[in-house]
Swiss-Prot record:
Molecular function as annotated in GO: ATP binding; glutaminyl-tRNA synthase (glutamine-hydrolyzing) activity
UniProt-recorded name of the protein: Glutamyl-tRNA(Gln) amidotransferase subunit A
Catalytic activity: L-glutamyl-tRNA(Gln) + L-glutamine + ATP + H2O = L-glutaminyl-tRNA(Gln) + L-glutamate + ADP + phosphate + H(+)
PANTHER family according to UniProt: GLUTAMYL-TRNA(GLN) AMIDOTRANSFERASE SUBUNIT A, TRANSAMIDASE
Amino acid sequence: MSDLHHKTVAELATLLHNKTLSSVELTQHFLSRIQQYNPKLNAYICTTADRALADAKASDERRQKGAAHSPLDGIPMGHKDLFCTKGIATTAGSKMLERFIPSYTATVVARLEAAGSVLTGKLSMDEFAMGSSNERSYFGAVYNPWDEQRIPGGSSGGSAAAVAARLIPYATGSDTGGSVRQPAAYCGITGIKPTYGTCSRWGMIAYASSLDQAGVLAKTAQDCALILNEMAGHDPKDSTSNPKALTQFDHELNRDLDGITIGLPSNYLAGLDAKIAEKLQQTAALYEKLGATIKEITLSATDVAIASYYLISSAEASSNLERFDGVHYGYRCANPKDLSDLYERSRSEGFGAEVKRRIMIGTYALSAGYYDAYYEQARRGRRAILNSFLQAFKECDVILGPTTPTTAYPLGSKVDDPVAMFLGDLYTVSANLAGLPALSHPAGFIDGLPVGCQLIGAHFSEPQLLNLAHRFQQETDFHQQIPEHYR
């Protein structure tokens, strides 16, 4: 079958289950697409073709014995390159970890391996997940398959570009301030960040520990639900893992929307690009047609979200990245004169400009003379944002808004303007600060570029968000569109 890349994870699972298709055939199809198209996209940092074919062969053998591990068994995928993979380089997109080969496997990776996933390789990302455009990778920029002169979003840009171009059916990502949802929106696919603590952070290279959360990028909400079924759940090895974390995400798919109230924040519309606002209103109208009630609400504290997010995340990054000093592991400068020179040059040469910028911001915010004025103020802003959401959820079940303020912008257009880059996360960072689940789904196109809309729910409401997006996708075909040169 030559159209296998058009199919969803759910459809591929059915073909494999019915033995209409073998995993080896499926894997060869996607490896061929990776070989053909990745040079145009630069989505992969490394590929693992031999490993993938071995995984696929093992999957076929299990299925012949009636012992498939899960619906995902035998389906190719890719991991964002900050999930540790034993024996396979894990770089976090940085020169600092260019030669780092982990001796252990991240819990998220291990759970998907146990489900029978077929690993095709490690996907590019902004260095240490610090970026919104995937121009900050040591291994070069990733290109948006809808327009290769534009960014795919970040920091999970490799994951988003690979799924959008149909190089793989799904990929993992991580989301600290929008790094799953924003690239999903720019690339015309579905991406979900679960409630903080739902997916284990063990073996995931840290950016900001109180904000980081593993997520999923796929064509559809149904696919995201099937994948989360396998990768989510409490992990005793991760102190931030929540014992209440859900392990079943597809049980509400196809439920009626009657009785569900969707809040539309009026302050999200102020200053929003008119064409994006039109897509948002059209999305709200379809949800209303499907039975939901649309109610205008106000989120009172979101004006401090960007400042609070960048201070907190930079402060945590400055602490997390202290370990990369040229002594323990990671990049080490050549011929250091003394220990001080070793530290200074290893970090100066090993980290890129954006990572060094955020380390400096974080170190400054945590310094004794400025802690109260900056970091503590940001923490108060974070609490206000959570309280604003909790108040909003007394009026509605789910909040609908834009995922991004614009469509994907040209490569290089904001790389020298960090404030403009930061503002691209305007609608996504609040969910991370509050630890809430949030999902972006395709909502149409503007001048040939995808637009995403975002659903934010109360803690552990992922099944409801996934059902809403699933019902929307049953009525639309935005998620089925493929960039012209990748069909």
